[in-house]
């Protein structure tokens, strides 16, 4: 599962959402300006800017990054 931690008026967040939709990838989005626990989580990962993308397999975090990274998103493209 892919989760995007974002904030309002964030061009890189919007670009990330668009790319995820174009690739057909399901994702959750969490607004860190409205969720203090989510903000604390991404800060604990070492990030200070949005978006932060976290990819999980089950309960395990597989990968995470900050910013618009279409190269990394493409790795998770659904194959038919």
Region roles according to the model:
Residues 9-11, 15-18, 43, 72-80:
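Non-globular targeting/processing and membrane-anchoring segments
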Residues 45-54:
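Structural micro-motif
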Residues 56-80:
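Non-catalytic, surface beta->alpha helical segment in thiol-disulfide oxidoreductase systems
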């Amino acid at each position: 599962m892919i989760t995007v931690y974002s904030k309002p008026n964030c061009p890189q967040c919007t670009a990330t959402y668009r790319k995820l939709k174009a690739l057909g990838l399901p994702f959750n989005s969490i607004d860190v300006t409205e969720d203090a626990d989510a903000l604390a989580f991404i800060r604990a990962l070492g990030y200070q800017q949005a978006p932060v993308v976290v990819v999980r397999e089950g309960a395990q975090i597989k990968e995470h990054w900050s910013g618009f990274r279409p190269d990394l998103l493409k790795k998770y493209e659904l194959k038919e």
